[in-house]
């Protein structure tokens, strides 16, 4: 596990995602509310490929739906497949609405260089569900079957983070589904003895983001292990 001190991520890490907060702010993924400088690439049907304005890595993209619709991945495994094969060398990921998405009211994915995520190569130290798909339809079907097998509240998507990366042949895509047991750890906060850490896909793939210098300097291996144990399921 690596740590990154990134104060620009404080907005995302500390985002309020309750209904009142979402209603009170304009959606920053809708085209009408984005800066004019944030131009879009339309290579993926139904989506806009955008440079993330608060990047974790030097190459970090957000892939936002053209429509303002809730963050949900059921029925969209084919989209993830096309994104992964359309961006070789990148890991495309999805943060569920209670699993790190700072815009749970607008469906979006993100993409970062796969080589920056240590656990993709070394393996994940907590429970994951993995499968490989060789076409978009299979990806959608297998992802939907996986989601249907997970526990969740009636009418709501299971709590998950999902990563997808194409293999060297750029045909087979590896999907890693991370079931979540909690949105944030018990230590989440800015008070004494607390840490402003809210794990999402990048954190759980081996690069934990710390917006505060205090957390970067004081988090121990045991602290990180406990944070992961509280938000993920054990092997």
Residue ranges of model-derived segments:
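Active-site microenvironments that recognize anionic phosphate/pyrophosphate groups
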Residues: 1-78, 90-99, 114-133, 139-235
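Short glycine-biased active-site loop of nucleotidyltransferases that positions the nucleotide triphosphate
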Residues: 101-104
């Amino acid at each position: 596990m690596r740590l990154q001190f990134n104060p620009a991520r404080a907005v995302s890490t500390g985002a309020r995602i309750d209904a009142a907060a979402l209603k009170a702010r304009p959606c920053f993924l809708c085209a009408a509310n984005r800066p004019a400088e944030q131009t879009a690439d339309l290579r993926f049907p139904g989506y806009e490929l955008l440079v993330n304005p608060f990047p974790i890595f030097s190459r970090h993209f957000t892939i936002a739906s053209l429509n303002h619709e809730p963050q949900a991945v059921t029925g969209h495994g084919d989209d993830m497949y096309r994104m992964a094969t359309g961006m070789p060398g990148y890991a495309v990921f999805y943060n569920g609405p209670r699993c790190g998405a700072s815009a749970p009211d607008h469906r979006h994915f993100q993409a970062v260089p796969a080589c920056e995520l240590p656990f993709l190569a070394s393996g994940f130290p907590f429970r994951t569900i993995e499968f490989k798909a060789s076409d978009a339809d299979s990806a959608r079907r297998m992802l939907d079957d996986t989601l249907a097998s997970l526990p969740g509240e009636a009418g709501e998507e299971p709590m998950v983070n999902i990563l997808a990366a194409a293999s060297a042949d750029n045909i087979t895509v590896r999907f890693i589904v991370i079931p979540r047991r909690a949105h944030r750890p018990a230590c989440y906060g800015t008070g004494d003895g607390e840490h402003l850490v809210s794990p999402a896909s990048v954190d759980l793939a081996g690069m934990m983001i710390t917006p505060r210098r205090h957390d970067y300097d004081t988090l121990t291996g045991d602290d990180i292990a406990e944070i992961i144990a509280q938000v993920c399921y054990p092997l």
